[in-house]
UniProtKB/Swiss-Prot annotation:
Coiled coil: none annotated. Oligomer forming an icosahedral capsid. This is 6,7-dimethyl-8-ribityllumazine synthase, chloroplastic. It comes from Arabidopsis thaliana. Belongs to the DMRL synthase family.
Amino acid sequence: MKSLASPPCLRLIPTAHRQLNSRQSSSACYIHGGSSVNKSNNLSFSSSTSGFASPLAVEKELRSSFVQTAAVRHVTGSLIRGEGLRFAIVVARFNEVVTKLLLEGAIETFKKYSVREEDIEVIWVPGSFEIGVVAQNLGKSGKFHAVLCIGAVIRGDTTHYDAVANSAASGVLSASINSGVPCIFGVLTCEDMDQALNRSGGKAGNKGAETALTALEMASLFEHHLK
């Protein structure tokens, strides 16, 4: 006669449920053959939330403890150390009424954060599709700490919009990876001209200015911490 195999033993590690007045427990609950054996009185697998900290509260507490650990080193770029950093801005001429406003927002932001005019170079290309290859060339030149990529793609009656928008995004990403220099994506992809104008100095702000802030932080991060 074949002997019956004993049912598997599963080990469940509790991650979120714990009592408010108890410390984090390292105990586990074992399930064997369909019956559970609780190894600690401090654990509960009840569906009731009464008397227990929420999973989000537990996660927040654990994350806070991790962040406060003295041995952890946190590194970030600075927005107050723009002096000496050099930037290239690749701008698409297509939809120029929008891209000029984005460019103005970027340059004004650079000046606000102490980047000198002589450390900013603007390169115009026909459209957003052509941005990637130029950005990669500029990144590899070794002259710039970051490259801004500015354009505006607005949906029309055909699928041309999707092709250009996707190609522009992948082109900028490839330029950044292949050159090792931050190439910042500042190409608007909008449903209509109103959306584009709202994002180039209108009620939704100026995305060119936001792109410049990203470029400043990334350039500072690479220059001062990642060399």
